[in-house]
Amino acid sequence: MNHLYRSFKTIALVGKPRNDINLQMHKNLFHWLMERGYQVLVEKEVAITLELPFEHLATLEEIGHRAQLAIVIGGDGNMLGRARVLAKYDIPLIGINRGNLGFLTDIDPKNAYSQLEACLERGEFFVEERFLLEAKIERASEIVSTSNAVNEAVIHPAKIAHMIDFHVYINDKFAFSQRSDGLIVSTPTGSTAYSLSAGGPILTPNLNAIALVPMFPHTLTSRPLVVDGDSKISIRFAEHNTSQLEVGCDSQITLPFTPDDVVHIQKSEHKLRLLHLKIIIITMC
């Protein structure tokens, strides 16, 4: 039993419903939690759509300050978007999978209420921490933009299918130069996402490691590189590159930059705290 469940007084429902079925689940779960005596906050846009009383509306930032648990209803994309914001508030998240793969969303919607009851009323869960990446754009010795990423930060040209030349430094030491369509810098969580499709290695979630995976490199010898998770990665660009470059964080946030800028990527100070169901396995002897 995890005694953390006793601290769950205010629970938030977050996620962006893609259809009426998902929207109805928000509504049903809202009433289910209210009937059990919890204070319930609902992400603002969803709460307005459901015409819930004003006191239950909250932005993600307000949820971070007020809730002790966030339930994400949707697929991994919903989890990624909410995790980037809520991680800095140290609030744990648990997901009900209404998407496709559900790598980060544990709960089966068909058994959602019984599984949530086990978590919320009997503490049958464990907490897993996963680190995020922080991407920063340096321009004329000043940081002009920044974003977190749960899965990966991808350096690429804004123009589709256009090669770029860049130099990678690890802990301020030159590592390699490359000419390719871009570079994927991935966490262990993201190693089974975009990084995997580019030939990157699969890393177990508890590894303290970062993978650097080239995207269509113009060479026969370029291979993915795995470095220590506490490494500080800097990428500098040749002047002749296209003037429009981007860092994409989890394919949801975009940081534009130019070849004169420097991209810095390292482990974020914030962590994603995921609640997972405890699975009891009975073996026959």
UniProtKB/Swiss-Prot annotation:
It catalyses: NAD(+) + ATP = ADP + NADP(+) + H(+). Pfam families: NAD_kinase, NAD_kinase_C. NAD(+) binds at D76, G77, N151, E152, H162, R179, D181, T192, A193, Y194, S195, L196, S197, Q252. Its cofactor is a divalent metal cation. It is an enzyme of class 2 (transferase). One of its GO terms (biological process) is NADP biosynthetic process. Keywords: ATP-binding, Cytoplasm, Kinase, NAD, NADP, Nucleotide-binding, Transferase. It comes from Haemophilus influenzae (strain ATCC 51907 / DSM 11121 / KW20 / Rd). InterPro entries: ATP-NAD_kinase_N, ATP-NAD_kinase_PpnK-typ_C, NAD/diacylglycerol_kinase_sf, NADK. It is found in: Cytoplasm. Belongs to the NAD kinase family. The keyword ATP-binding applies. Gene3D superfamilies: Probable inorganic polyphosphate/atp-NAD kinase, domain 1, Probable inorganic polyphosphate/atp-NAD kinase, domain 2. One of its GO terms (molecular function) is ATP binding. It comes from the Bacteria. This is NAD kinase. The keyword NAD applies. The active site is at D76 (proton acceptor). Involved in the regulation of the intracellular balance of NAD and NADP, and is a key enzyme in the biosynthesis of NADP. Catalyzes specifically the phosphorylation on 2'-hydroxyl of the adenosine moiety of NAD to yield NADP. Its EC number is 2.7.1.23. GO terms for cellular component: cytoplasm.
